[in-house]
């Protein structure tokens, strides 16, 4: 595995697998045949839009007031990937079930989302590794 391959999802094997499972779910759901696997986006839609798929594992079905998170590796602010849309998913730790939470334009995500500095204790979880922008699942658009 090259550096780009590992840096895309982080170096943890489970995160890499979870990320690719999420991409495959969206490819099947939207009828996309090829994974782009670019640093800034994962897939290209049939309409030519760049899609960044954000998938995390979980222990149970997420609630609408839970957050979707986009981490930033820019230590001084927000690093925005060069994509048109974010699509968020959650997958059970044992991979038995998953949920497509919704989609949002990248610009809208950062306008509506709340920026959280690295090291911030945010209630039930902390942002230890990176700055992040968060947005409640309920703020996402649903696929129809």
Annotate each PLM feature:
Residues 1-49, 54-144:
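Nucleic-acid endonuclease domains
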């Amino acid at each position: 595995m090259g550096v780009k391959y590992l840096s895309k999802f982080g170096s943890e094997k489970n995160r890499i697998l979870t990320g690719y499972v999420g991409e495959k779910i969206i490819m099947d759901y939207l009828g996309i045949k090829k994974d782009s696997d670019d640093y800034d986006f994962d897939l290209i839609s049939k309409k030519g839009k760049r899609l960044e798929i954000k998938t995390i594992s979980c222990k149970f079905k997420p609630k609408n007031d839970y957050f979707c998170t986009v981490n930033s590796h820019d230590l001084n602010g927000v690093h925005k990937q060069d994509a048109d849309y974010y699509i968020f998913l959650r997958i059970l730790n044992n991979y038995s079930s998953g949920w497509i939470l919704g989609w949002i334009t990248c610009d809208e995500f950062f306008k509506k989302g709340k920026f959280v500095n690295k090291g911030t204790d945010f209630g039930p979880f902390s942002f230890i590794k990176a700055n992040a922008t968060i947005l409640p699942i309920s703020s996402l658009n649903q696929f129809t």
